[in-house]
């Protein structure tokens, strides 16, 4: 079973086929660090040879991945940690996303890898591709996010020199050296002469995200289509609860039609590491990391506009009391720091 965004193995030269190998190892559980195939005798638990598929359970709303509540053994733990954080420089996710973009949109040769470019530290290697081909991009197994763009670009015809878009242009004027895979993707997208796709970098809150920005002309909505796989640590906040309980669609980064986004934290500080991912045709619908549960539920408020979302969290303040708080626009950007490996339905 190929990954949802890695090219077919037969289409990639052996020395460049990193993505499919990582997919097989981390997701399917095939092969080990030394390149040898695992046998069922390698571990007492047969699930240890199945990668993330070992915890897959089909549900009416998509695939459910229930990872172990405690990570104690070496083999399974490394598979899970690698797959959810991509500790080896996001290698599998970034190359996979780059290959997918190249094959689906850029129509380049299968064996041509992007040129490497280093992004400034304040951009944190974050690349967004903008496309008005919503029909094509929406068919991938990814999650959509909504943003209104960089405010500095809307204040006048002249772009701010500090805007991500301006900095991205400077990157490709040869001001920086070569670096990681996200930089590769940035260069490749920037070189693309197409009205249907635009390379763009976001701020630090969206770091390490490789995504497609699509425009729905009928609804005038812009959505971010997430392609990569890393799940960095979520930054909790000790801010006081906001006075209002609803964030309008125009101010929300998460765009999930007729749904609310609820963030809750386990009340017990001793809650073990628990990770869970629910997927359906539109993407990740639930995931948790280090005791923090992030999940999407249908809105029970019939008066709520389908274009709006509610984002709340149950966080601990400095006095160690649990309190529910609204996630403001800035904190919502942290939602984009949570990605799930693109497991095919």
Swiss-Prot record:
Cystine pairs: none
InterPro entries, sorted: DUF3713
Basic and acidic residues compositional bias, start-end: 27-39
Top-rank taxon: Bacteria
Record region (Disordered): 1-58, 139-165
Pfam families tied to this protein: DUF3713
Polar residues: bias regions: 154-165
Family the entry assigns: Belongs to the MG307/MG309/MG338 family.
Name of the protein described by the UniProt record: Uncharacterized protein MPN_438
Organism annotation: Mycoplasma pneumoniae (strain ATCC 29342 / M129 / Subtype 1)
């Amino acid at each position: 079973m190929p990954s949802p965004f890695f090219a077919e193995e037969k289409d990639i030269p052996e020395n460049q086929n990193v993505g499919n190998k990582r997919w097989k190892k981390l997701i399917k559980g095939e092969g080990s660090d030394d390149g040898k195939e695992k046998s069922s005798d390698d571990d007492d638990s047969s699930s240890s040879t199945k990668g993330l598929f070992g915890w897959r359970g089909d549900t009416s709303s998509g695939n459910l991945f229930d990872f172990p509540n405690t990570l104690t053994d070496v083999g399974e733990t490394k598979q899970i940690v690698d797959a959810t954080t991509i500790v080896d420089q996001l290698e599998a996710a970034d190359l996979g996303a780059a290959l997918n973009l190249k094959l689906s949109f850029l129509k380049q040769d299968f064996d041509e890898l992007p040129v490497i470019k280093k992004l400034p530290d304040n951009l944190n290697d974050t690349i967004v591709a903008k496309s008005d081909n919503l029909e094509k991009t929406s068919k991938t197994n990814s999650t959509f996010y909504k943003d209104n763009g960089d405010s500095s670009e809307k204040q006048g015809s002249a772009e701010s020199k500090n805007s991500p878009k301006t900095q991205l242009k400077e990157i490709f004027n040869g001001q920086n050296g070569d670096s990681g895979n996200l930089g590769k993707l940035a260069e490749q997208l920037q070189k693309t002469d197409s009205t249907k796709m635009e390379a763009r970098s976001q701020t630090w809150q969206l770091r390490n995200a490789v995504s497609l920005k699509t425009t729905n002309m009928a609804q005038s909505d812009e959505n971010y289509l997430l392609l990569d796989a890393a799940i960095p640590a979520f930054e909790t906040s000790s801010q006081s609860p906001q006075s209002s309980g609803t964030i309008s669609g125009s101010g929300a980064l998460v765009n999930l039609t007729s749904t609310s986004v609820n963030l809750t934290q386990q009340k017990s500080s001793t809650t073990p590491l628990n990770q869970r991912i629910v997927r359906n045709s539109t993407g990740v619908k639930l995931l948790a990391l280090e005791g923090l549960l992030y999940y999407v539920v249908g809105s029970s408020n019939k008066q709520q506009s389908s274009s709006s979302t509610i984002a709340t969290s149950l966080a601990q303040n400095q006095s160690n009391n649990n309190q529910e708080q609204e996630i403001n626009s800035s904190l919502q950007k942290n939602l984009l720091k949570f990605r799930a490996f693109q497991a095919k339905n």
